[in-house]
């Protein structure tokens, strides 16, 4: 198990719920239709990659290689901050240049999934 990643996943899950509630209740009248859609996309990817981070943290228990799983966790953490963070800020602030940053976060998220696959491929076969 990658303990730090599981702790970060717990904190990220707490933040994802808080931001989702804030977006649904605190910002619903402030954001236009496009702003709500952008905020919802940020929230959805935040939740999905919080769960990915938790799974990646526990994958070595199931036999996945530890180093690729650590890389996956780091990439998902950075990717979530850059991808979802830029979208949250774009939705709230309307600063269009933030949209140019978002794809870099998406790329980190994709590479994280690839690294999880590498970890599963390289790890020893474990029967649970």
Regions found by a protein language model. Give the residues of each.
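Polytopic transmembrane helical bundles with strong interfacial aromatic enrichment
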Residues: 1-128
């Amino acid at each position: 198990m990658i303990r730090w990643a599981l702790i970060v996943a717990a904190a990220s899950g707490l933040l994802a719920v808080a931001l989702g509630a804030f977006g649904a209740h605190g910002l619903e009248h402030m954001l236009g239709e496009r702003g709500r859609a952008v905020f919802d996309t940020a929230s959805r990817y935040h939740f999905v990659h919080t769960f990915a981070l938790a799974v990646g943290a526990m994958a070595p228990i199931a036999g996945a290689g530890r180093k690729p799983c650590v890389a996956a966790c780091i990439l998902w953490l950075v990717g979530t901050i850059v991808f979802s963070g830029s979208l949250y800020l774009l939705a709230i602030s309307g600063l269009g240049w933030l949209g140019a940053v978002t794809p870099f976060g998406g790329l980190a998220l994709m590479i994280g999934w690839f690294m999880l696959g590498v970890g599963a491929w390289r790890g020893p076969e474990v029967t649970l």
